[in-house]
Curated annotation (Swiss-Prot):
HAMAP family: Rota_VP6 (MF_04126). Belongs to the rotavirus VP6 family. Intermediate capsid protein that self assembles to form an icosahedral capsid with a T=13 symmetry, which consists of 230 trimers of VP6, with channels at each of its five-fold vertices. This capsid constitutes the middle concentric layer of the viral mature particle. The innermost VP2 capsid and the intermediate VP6 capsid remain intact following cell entry to protect the dsRNA from degradation and to prevent unfavorable antiviral responses in the host cell during all the replication cycle of the virus. Its main location: virion. Homotrimer. Interacts with the inner capsid protein VP2. Interacts with the outer capsid glycoprotein VP7. Keywords: Capsid protein, Intermediate capsid protein, Virion. This is Intermediate capsid protein VP6. It is found in: Virion. InterPro entries: Rotavirus_A/C_VP6 (IPR001385). The keyword Ubl conjugation does not apply.
């Protein structure tokens, strides 16, 4: 989009100006920066644009960008004038975002529609397709002008409830005869308790929001003493089982767990131990775990009497803590990353919802909601707003 590309170029120029140091000799790069600044100043200085202010009123925004004389040494006054001039330009661009963002669009747009915004874009006259915030580049991705960027993400795991109740043979009211799972997974963390009320391994899956790779940590937590099991396929008015559990992590060994990393249903890697693992590109982690077995039963406590028959008084239990330390994936509208925070902060200050004369209804005013949480009829509108704010968030 032309406004986003203009913001990108002005952000880049601001960074170059900030990299200059006053009262020192200016070399070729510094001279180029001053020339680029002067080119914009000669076109924009003194011009007035009627755009939306922070209370959504049309107000005159005047650009104050005096031309800087070319010299071998940049004075402190000239450096401060350049910095203030670019800030004046950012005031206009922020108002342009509020103005253009208030206009609804039903498809991906590449050109500003508001006449005053288009006038400002043409007067500034510089553009750059690339932003340091990958969310600002998503409209370029949508129009096939750019590939998705590979970046660290904050929420590789899909939010899911990991509940299972599988009876086998005889059962009792303390969890005997059941294979059960009770757990949750979201963001980078999953915590799952495995109750093994009869022989046999238990398998469960952790699904990724998007295919990713990174570093994974698995460790054991103290298991609860009593836990209410899910009803599984039983009628909702059934009385749930309260499993009486014994933490058997003291005898848990490498052979008791198998971790498989899957991509599109195909196993691409595996491991059979706890600890820290570098996992390959995958969209699912499948874990098979067996807290207790026949060999361990040979010297079992009396609480585990008749465990093979499913009628033990207490059940072997393990609580597994899964933590994805870091993960990288192609940035998409639904992925969360560190780049959301700064833009969302601006949505509470410079770009509050009240500063837009019209905003998408039934949408929480955060970057995540604008990018992926809007109704289908508003999604292109909300993404336009989000991408513009994301580009602006890269300014110093």
């Amino acid at each position: 989009m032309d406004l986003i590309e203009t913001i990108n170029a002005v952000v880049e120029l601001q960074h170059r100006v900030r990299n200059l140091s006053p009262n020192t000799n200016i070399y070729q790069d510094g001279q180029t920066t001053i020339n680029d600044y002067n080119a914009i100043a000669s076109r924009c200085n003194g011009k007035v644009y009627n755009l939306r202010d922070q209370i959504a009123q049309l107000s005159p925004f005047q650009v104050h960008m005096p031309v800087i004389p070319i010299s071998t040494i940049l004075s402190t006054d000239d450096h401060e004038t350049m910095s203030a001039g670019i800030e004046s330009l950012f005031d206009v661009l922020a108002a342009a975002i509020r103005t253009e963002g208030s206009r609804q669009n039903r498809a991906v747009v590449t050109k500003s529609i508001e006449p005053e915004v288009l006038k400002a874009v043409l007067d500034i006259g510089i553009r750059s397709q690339f932003s340091e915030n990958p969310y600002a580049n998503m409209l370029q991705v949508d129009t096939a002008k750019m590939e998705q960027q590979l970046e660290p993400i904050d929420d590789p795991l899909a939010s899911q409830r990991i509940n299972m109740l599988a009876a086998g043979g005889a059962t009792n009211n303390t969890g005997g005869g059941y294979h059960a799972l009770v757990g949750r997974a979201t963001g980078k963390t999953g915590i799952i308790t495995i109750i093994q009320g009869r022989p046999g391994a238990v398998t469960f899956n952790l699904n990724m929001k998007v295919p990713c790779s990174g570093v994974l940590s698995l460790t054991l937590l103290p298991a609860p003493g009593v836990i209410q099991l899910s009803l599984g396929n039983q009628p909702p008015n059934n009385i749930p089982v309260h499993a009486e559990c014994v933490d058997v992590s003291t005898v848990f060994t490498e052979g008791d767990i198998v971790i498989r990393f899957e991509l599109a249903g195909r196993v691409v890697g595996n491991a059979n131990k706890l600890g820290t693992l570098n996992f390959p590109l995958c969209d699912r982690i499948s874990i098979t775990i067996e807290p207790w077995n026949a060999n361990k039963q040979n010297n079992a406590n009396a609480n585990f009497n008749n465990w093979p028959a499913g009628t033990a008084q207490r059940q072997p239990t393990i609580s597994l803590f899964v933590n994805i330390i870091n993960a990288s994936s192609l940035i998409d509208y639904e992925t969360h990353s560190k780049y959301l925070a700064g833009a969302t902060y601006l949505m509470g200050t410079t770009f509050s919802e009240d500063s837009f004369i019209a905003s998408p209804p039934n949408v929480v005013w955060t970057m995540s909601s604008l990018l992926s949480g809007a109704p289908p009829q508003y999604i292109h509108w909300t993404r336009k707003i989000a991408c513009m704010i994301a580009a602006f968030s890269c300014k110093i």
